[in-house]
């Protein structure tokens, strides 16, 4: 798997990006091959008239395959899913029909704080009456510290954007990573492999090479993870994120860790970066951690216009890293080094950290 993934990164950068002259470092192997995920999202369905909970069948958005044990989830996470299903079956609630858009039970999201012992169980349903007391009691019985009922009003397959009701415990859980404590709300994005997130963020900090005085922009910052890891060795960190709740989470995480030199701005990266770059405070370093789709071309152009000395690009998709790095090369940057990190064994997904430096 490691050889295949490393070759895929090399091919993407050279073939799709037309890039060369960079150092492709050996892929960092995962600490654990199985049961490494701290979060999994399951879907409800029906088999022979009985409620089930599992994953979509390959290539299908309507068929749900039940499972007894997911080998990427912990034993505790699997137990939480099984007990949740046992608690819901007697209630006679219908699973959501993804063709007819009828039914009630949609998704079950199980998230753990692997290093804190916290456990959050979130039930996602369609609108309608629901007495969640017996469900919450069952979840607390398996150690859940946060039990949430989310109502999704959209017809699409999504666990985001609903109305949340706290059934038991706290609305957030906490996790320890890279020497920091992170508070995670119901919809907060956080790397799903805690052990390898340490490696990923450590690599980003290594590539950043901070001396203690630099101004850093953390773009697509989410809940502030990377920026807060960099902050103790930086002069100033400015995080930019389009999701309002994520910005609130980032500010809360800064306060939780007593970090005072990091600020977070809500807005589109392209727009905010233009405003920041027009001011006197130019960045020395830009860190970007975009979604799988990569960056918009205008956002890449804005980064080049801001003219930081270094860019650290944290990528979850080498096929979008390649064209983004190629566009930055056209804007005066050189791809120096790339280090793949195997965050997700037994899957085709690859994380990379890339360092680009401004030429001249």
Language model segments and positions:
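Extended interfacial segments that mediate partner engagement and assembly in macromolecular machines
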Residues: 1-97, 115, 129
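Rossmann-like S-adenosyl-L-methionine
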Residues: 132-360
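Feature of Fe-S/electron-transfer and energy-metabolism proteins
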Residues: 31-37, 83, 104-107, 217, ...
């Amino acid at each position: 798997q490691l050889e295949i993934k490393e070759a895929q990164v090399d091919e993407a950068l050279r073939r799709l990006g037309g890039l060369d002259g960079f150092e492709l470092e050996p892929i960092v192997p995962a600490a654990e091959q199985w049961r490494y995920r701290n979060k999994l999202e399951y879907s409800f369905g029906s088999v022979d008239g009985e409620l089930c909970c599992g994953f979509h069948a390959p290539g299908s958005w309507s068929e749900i395959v039940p499972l007894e044990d997911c080998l990427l989830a912990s034993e505790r996470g699997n137990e939480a899913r099984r007990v949740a299903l046992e608690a819901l079956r007697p209630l006679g609630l219908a699973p959501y029909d993804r063709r007819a858009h009828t039914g009630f039970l949609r998704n079950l999201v199980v998230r753990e704080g692997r290093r804190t012992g916290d456990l959050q169980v979130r039930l996602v349903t369609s609108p309608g009456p629901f007495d969640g007391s017996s469900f919450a009691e069952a979840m607390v019985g398996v150690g859940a510290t946060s039990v949430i009922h989310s109502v999704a009003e959209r017809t699409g397959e999504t666990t985001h954007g609903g109305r949340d009701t706290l059934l038991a415990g706290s609305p957030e859980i906490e996790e320890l990573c890279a020497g920091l404590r992170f508070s995670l709300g119901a919809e907060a994005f956080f790397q799903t492999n805690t052990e390898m997130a340490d490696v990923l963020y450590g690599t980003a900090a290594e590539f950043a090479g901070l001396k203690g005085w630099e101004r850093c922009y953390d773009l697509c910052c989410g809940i502030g993870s990377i920026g807060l890891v960099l902050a103790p060795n930086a002069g100033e960190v400015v995080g930019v994120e389009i999701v309002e709740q994520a910005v609130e989470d980032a500010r809360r995480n800064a306060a939780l860790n007593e970090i005072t030199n990091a600020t977070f701005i809500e807005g589109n990266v392209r727009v905010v970066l233009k405003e920041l770059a027009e001011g006197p405070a130019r960045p020395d370093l830009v860190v970007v951690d975009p979604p799988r789709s990569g960056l918009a071309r205008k956002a890449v152009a804005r980064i080049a216009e801001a003219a930081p000395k270094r860019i650290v690009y944290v990528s979850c998709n080498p096929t979008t890293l390649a064209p983004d790095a190629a566009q930055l090369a056209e804007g005066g940057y050189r791809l120096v080094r790339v280090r793949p990190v195997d965050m997700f064994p037994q899957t085709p997904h690859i994380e990379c950290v890339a360092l680009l430096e401004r030429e001249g």
